[in-house]
Regions:
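A contiguous loop/helix-start segment that scaffolds small-molecule binding in enzyme catalytic cores
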Residues: 1-58
């Protein structure tokens, strides 16, 4: 579901809006990435089945 949410956000919101994806915060694969939605649209990522928090900045 996480990957589908990112894909949906990139098609519905302005490309200049920032999206922060914080995943597996208490695990060994901890990751916090912030980039414009226009970059998320072309990025390679896989956050499925990983506890993830999404933050949007306008």
């Amino acid at each position: 579901r996480n990957n589908r949410l990112i894909a949906e956000l990139t098609t519905r919101l302005p490309g200049s809006m920032l999206l922060c994806v914080a995943s597996d915060l208490t695990g060994s694969r901890q990751s916090i990435v912030t980039r414009p939605l226009s970059q998320w649209a072309t990025a390679t990522y896989n956050y499925d089945k990983i506890p993830t928090i999404f933050l949007l900045f306008s």
